[in-house]
């Protein structure tokens, strides 16, 4: 009986499937990426970044060295320079991975004192403790104001307290720093010394002569006089300017003509100074301007300490990109598992092929009733199932 074309087709499919499984098993066990046929000569250690072992399926064992330009070279692991290079790379990788490549540095809080603002103040005002009140500062203010009045007619240069305060203000704005609370007393003294006015009797009697003398001296000066200010003790909301700018700098005008005009027009100053007596002291409540938080005038007037805002500065850099070599270890269990799966798949294919062939043969088999009919002692027997040729067999 000759096999049908369908049987040949099934056999051919089984053969191709078997041919596919066998190379797959071979490639699964032999994963050699780098074939080391030629070993390299000595390479400087400074040019190497990592190394790795070649696969066992490559046959010849070698060390694959990678340079800084990401080029790979094969080296003999038995040579001494190769072993030294491996030790150096292992030590370097261990040093990098010891702390994870992350470091944190703490910078101590540095709050520089304001030296320019206190240039025109007495040493006793600078050494005041934090709990100094306005009554303690009043004595210093009177002496400072008397010295300022005495030197105003002879000196062409403005007092150092005003120039120092303006310079320190610009520097503090540029640096973005916040002064400590113990320097509040120096700020208040510098601010109050710029707003001290003469007594009402002197102001009313010699206002015209003083204005003329001031007008003759003002064009030669380069900075505004401490007498020219738009701050008023009765209105603390005008004293507090925008954040980061002191009140005695915000309201000033650099032109002496406009400052003299503001003296004559503004009635608030005349009313306030006429109500004062010659022995009265000035007690304005001016809050020092901070770059982060502005305390209320009530807290400054009562002598309470402003809240400290000190945040540690952490300089944390990103972790370094570590390229730690991970050498692949061949897993024998995985290889055995792959072989078992491949064998089971092949046996399953053979079983399916046998069932298909048996079913085909059973379909092509001839039943007994088709053996033929007897005619005159002869029986017609077909040559094969499904054929139209018969053979006469004597009975």
From Swiss-Prot:
<dbReference type="GO" id="GO:0032233">
    <property type="term" value="P:positive regulation of actin filament bundle assembly"/>
</dbReference>
<protein>
    <recommendedName>
        <fullName>Fractalkine</fullName>
    </recommendedName>
</protein>
<dbReference type="GO" id="GO:0009986">
    <property type="term" value="C:cell surface"/>
</dbReference>
<feature type="disulfide bond">
    <location>
        <begin position="36"/>
        <end position="74"/>
    </location>
</feature>
<dbReference type="Pfam" id="PF00048">
    <property type="entry name" value="IL8"/>
</dbReference>
<feature type="disulfide bond">
    <location>
        <begin position="32"/>
        <end position="58"/>
    </location>
</feature>
<dbReference type="GO" id="GO:0005886">
    <property type="term" value="C:plasma membrane"/>
</dbReference>
<dbReference type="GO" id="GO:0048247">
    <property type="term" value="P:lymphocyte chemotaxis"/>
</dbReference>
<feature type="region of interest" description="Mucin-like stalk">
    <location>
        <begin position="101"/>
        <end position="336"/>
    </location>
</feature>
<dbReference type="GO" id="GO:0019221">
    <property type="term" value="P:cytokine-mediated signaling pathway"/>
</dbReference>
<feature type="region of interest" description="Disordered">
    <location>
        <begin position="148"/>
        <end position="180"/>
    </location>
</feature>
<dbReference type="GO" id="GO:0050729">
    <property type="term" value="P:positive regulation of inflammatory response"/>
</dbReference>
<feature type="region of interest" description="Disordered">
    <location>
        <begin position="201"/>
        <end position="305"/>
    </location>
</feature>
<feature type="region of interest" description="Chemokine and involved in interaction with ITGAV:ITGB3 and ITGA4:ITGB1">
    <location>
        <begin position="25"/>
        <end position="100"/>
    </location>
</feature>
<keyword id="KW-0472">Membrane</keyword>
<feature type="transmembrane region" description="Helical">
    <location>
        <begin position="337"/>
        <end position="357"/>
    </location>
</feature>
<dbReference type="GO" id="GO:0008009">
    <property type="term" value="F:chemokine activity"/>
</dbReference>
<dbReference type="GO" id="GO:0043410">
    <property type="term" value="P:positive regulation of MAPK cascade"/>
</dbReference>
<dbReference type="GO" id="GO:0045237">
    <property type="term" value="F:CXCR1 chemokine receptor binding"/>
</dbReference>
<dbReference type="InterPro" id="IPR001811">
    <property type="entry name" value="Chemokine_IL8-like_dom"/>
</dbReference>
<dbReference type="GO" id="GO:0043025">
    <property type="term" value="C:neuronal cell body"/>
</dbReference>
<dbReference type="GO" id="GO:0032914">
    <property type="term" value="P:positive regulation of transforming growth factor beta1 production"/>
</dbReference>
<dbReference type="GO" id="GO:0045766">
    <property type="term" value="P:positive regulation of angiogenesis"/>
</dbReference>
<dbReference type="GO" id="GO:0110091">
    <property type="term" value="P:negative regulation of hippocampal neuron apoptotic process"/>
</dbReference>
<feature type="topological domain" description="Extracellular">
    <location>
        <begin position="25"/>
        <end position="336"/>
    </location>
</feature>
<comment type="similarity">
    <text>Belongs to the intercrine delta family.</text>
</comment>
<feature type="site" description="Cleavage; to produce soluble form">
    <location>
        <begin position="337"/>
        <end position="338"/>
    </location>
</feature>
<dbReference type="GO" id="GO:0002523">
    <property type="term" value="P:leukocyte migration involved in inflammatory response"/>
</dbReference>
<keyword id="KW-0202">Cytokine</keyword>
<dbReference type="GO" id="GO:0070098">
    <property type="term" value="P:chemokine-mediated signaling pathway"/>
</dbReference>
<dbReference type="GO" id="GO:0007155">
    <property type="term" value="P:cell adhesion"/>
</dbReference>
<feature type="compositionally biased region" description="Polar residues">
    <location>
        <begin position="148"/>
        <end position="172"/>
    </location>
</feature>
<dbReference type="GO" id="GO:0048246">
    <property type="term" value="P:macrophage chemotaxis"/>
</dbReference>
<dbReference type="GO" id="GO:0006935">
    <property type="term" value="P:chemotaxis"/>
</dbReference>
<keyword id="KW-1015">Disulfide bond</keyword>
<dbReference type="GO" id="GO:0031664">
    <property type="term" value="P:regulation of lipopolysaccharide-mediated signaling pathway"/>
</dbReference>
<dbReference type="GO" id="GO:0032720">
    <property type="term" value="P:negative regulation of tumor necrosis factor production"/>
</dbReference>
<dbReference type="GO" id="GO:0051041">
    <property type="term" value="P:positive regulation of calcium-independent cell-cell adhesion"/>
</dbReference>
<dbReference type="GO" id="GO:0008284">
    <property type="term" value="P:positive regulation of cell population proliferation"/>
</dbReference>
<keyword id="KW-0395">Inflammatory response</keyword>
<dbReference type="GO" id="GO:0030593">
    <property type="term" value="P:neutrophil chemotaxis"/>
</dbReference>
<dbReference type="InterPro" id="IPR034127">
    <property type="entry name" value="Chemokine_CX3C"/>
</dbReference>
